[in-house]
């Protein structure tokens, strides 16, 4: 079990390092790929996820996948909380590493870049706040992700 938890921690951290890193590069001032666009970002995310799956094998890297695997009997329910904690901590460490790597760019971007764009490096929110529809969209996206 410890081996699996370490794999979840490292794979999730590496995935977030790719994903948050590309958004830092795309959004923050004076980065090499500033303004490179959405296609660059999603391609880097896809590459990062693929690399993590190749290196670490059958990892989940997402609590929704852990929940689905527990529900399908592929993982015991006793693994749910430890896996989610390992993934959460891995994501936190990956985001923290990105913040430290791009700290000078964050400082330089203050006042020059929309604060919402900077916040969206680490999180997202709906442009149109309609909670039932937002929930529906996330449900469909998660279902597609799980299949």
Segments predicted by a language model, with ranges:
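Membrane-interface helix-loop junctions and terminal tails of multi-pass membrane proteins
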Residues: 1-147
């Amino acid at each position: 079990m410890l081996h699996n938890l370490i794999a979840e921690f490292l794979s999730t951290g590496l995935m977030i390092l790719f994903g948050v890193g590309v958004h830092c590069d795309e959004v923050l001032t004076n980065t090499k790929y500033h303004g490179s666009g959405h296609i660059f970002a999603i391609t880097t995310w896809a590459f990062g996820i693929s690399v993590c799956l190749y290196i670490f094998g059958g990892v989940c890297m997402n609590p929704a996948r852990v929940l689905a695997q527990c529900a399908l009997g592929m993982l015991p329910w006793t693994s749910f909380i430890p896996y989610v904690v390992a993934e959460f901590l891995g994501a936190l460490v990956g985001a923290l590493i990105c913040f430290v790597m791009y700290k000078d760019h964050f400082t330089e971007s203050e006042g020059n870049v929309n604060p919402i764009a900077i916040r969206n490096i680490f999180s997202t929110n709906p442009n149109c706040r309609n909670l039932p529809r937002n929930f529906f969209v996330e449900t469909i996206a998660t279902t597609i992700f799980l299949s």
